[in-house]
């Protein structure tokens, strides 16, 4: 079996092919399904569609009017989209262009929120976005009094690249990728944790409001996860990839109660890390493909997997994506992860005292012939709080990497809105 790795689409094909090559219990019929209540209009990754490709959502709760809460979502080169709770678009913001036509354009990858950032003397909610194309963060103020255009760019003009030394390095695109925000309850300082594309590095960036009403940031420290792993049989395993690429992280979420970062290393598993990037990371679960050797063929740009030595996990099929938390006031809840290779979502106990043990899994299946489920899901966001009459028990928003029905041969993606109460009932 030969697997091409030259593009994101090809990487998804790798996951699918590997999934079908193993006897995976998660592909059996025993996993329960929930169904979406709404979906966004499809996004198309072509010139006519503005090269828009759905990736990662965040849910902003309007505390004054929860029924008018918003979903803020990245569309890669298509910029940022803002939706109401009926999944209708209320605002579209473009990704910034590159410095010149020869440079990479802006490409928004992940988004997360910070509540109550002090800006211009007032507490303000902001959306923080990783701009992979320009290797920067973009920060947007959220204004509940502007329903037709609630987001305003407040990124400081002097904001520096996150990982790159110059524009040439930016164009190599080992740039800002995954993102999660965190506010330290002890100090009140707010941060973004940002992963580096095609590398194992995670950076901790402190958000810095300025006197001009903009937001800058500074790097506090970085942490490098392993790229190779010692197996129980004494062998050393490195996930197969194109030459020069390392197993990257994208999906990340921070538990606000104790400052724990959960980071999904796509071809490896889920790490538990102190959000301050101190201490030793703990791998709490592995993908099924963990330990499977692969040989990369430069002529075909393909990877041939070898025999499975049996050291992988039993719940996740690579890529692991879309980490999000379902939080309860008493500390209970779930860590959810998108098991992209078999189109399931895996739930772990939120509590570290329980060692984040596996709890259950579910799928998001089609609700009708016109409202499909979620496949090859990238980003996900959950909010366990009442959101008006539409979602009185909270909301789960997930990316759909294969939006159907599409438009002929055009690649279509979008977002599905799911009643979080139904998800919790399924997990319990």
Give the location of each predicted region.
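Secretory targeting and sorting signals
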Residues: 2-28
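Detector for methionine-enriched segments
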Residues: 1-2, 252
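Sequence/structural signature of beta-propeller domains
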Residues: 29-428
């Amino acid at each position: 079996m030969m697997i091409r790795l030259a593009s994101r689409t090809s990487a998804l094909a790798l996951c699918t092919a590997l999934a079908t090559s193993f006897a995976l219990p998660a592909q059996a019929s025993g996993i329960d399904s929930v169904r979406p209540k709404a979906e966004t209009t499809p996004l198309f990754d072509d010139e006519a569609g503005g090269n828009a490709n759905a990736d990662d959502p965040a849910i902003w709760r309007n505390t004054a009017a929860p029924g008018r809460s918003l979903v803020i979502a990245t569309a890669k080169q298509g910029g940022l989209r803002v939706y109401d709770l009926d999944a209708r678009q209320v605002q579209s913001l473009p990704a910034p262009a590159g410095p010149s036509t020869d440079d990479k354009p802006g490409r928004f990858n992940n988004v997360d929120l910070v509540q109550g950032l002090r800006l211009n003397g007032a507490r303000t909610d902001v959306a923080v976005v990783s701009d992979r194309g320009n290797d920067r963060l973009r920060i947007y103020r959220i204004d509940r009094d502007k329903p037709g255009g609630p987001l305003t760019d407040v990124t400081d003009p002097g904001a520096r690249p996150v990982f790159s030394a110059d524009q040439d390095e930016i164009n190599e695109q080992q740039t800002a990728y995954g993102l999660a925000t965190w506010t330290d309850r002890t100090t009140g300082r707010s941060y973004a944790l940002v992963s580096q594309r095609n590398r194992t590095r995670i950076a901790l960036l402190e958000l810095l409001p300025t006197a001009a009403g903009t937001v800058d940031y500074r790097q506090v420290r970085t942490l490098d996860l392993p790229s190779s792993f010692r197996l129980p049989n004494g062998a050393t395993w490195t996930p197969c990839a194109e030459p020069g690429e390392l197993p990257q992280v994208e999906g990340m979420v921070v538990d606000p109660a104790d400052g724990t970062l959960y980071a999904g290393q796509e071809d490896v598993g889920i790490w538990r890390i102190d959000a301050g990037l101190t201490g030793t990371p703990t791998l709490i679960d592995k993908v099924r493909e963990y330990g499977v050797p692969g040989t990369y063929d430069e002529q075909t740009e393909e990877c041939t997997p070898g025999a499975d030595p049996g050291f992988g996990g039993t719940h996740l099929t690579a890529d692991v994506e879309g980490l999000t938390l379902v939080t309860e006031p008493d500390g209970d809840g779930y860590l959810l992860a998108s098991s992209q290779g078999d189109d399931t979502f895996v739930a772990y106990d939120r509590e570290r005292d329980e060692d984040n043990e596996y709890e259950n899994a579910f799928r998001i299946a089609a609700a009708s012939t016109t409202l499909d489920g979620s496949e090859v899901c990238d980003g996900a966001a959950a909010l366990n709080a009442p959101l008006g009459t539409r979602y009185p028990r909270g909301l789960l928003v997930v990316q759909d990497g294969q939006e159907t029905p599409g438009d002929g041969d055009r690649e279509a993606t979008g977002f599905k809105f799911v009643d979080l109460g139904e998800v919790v009932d399924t997990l319990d």
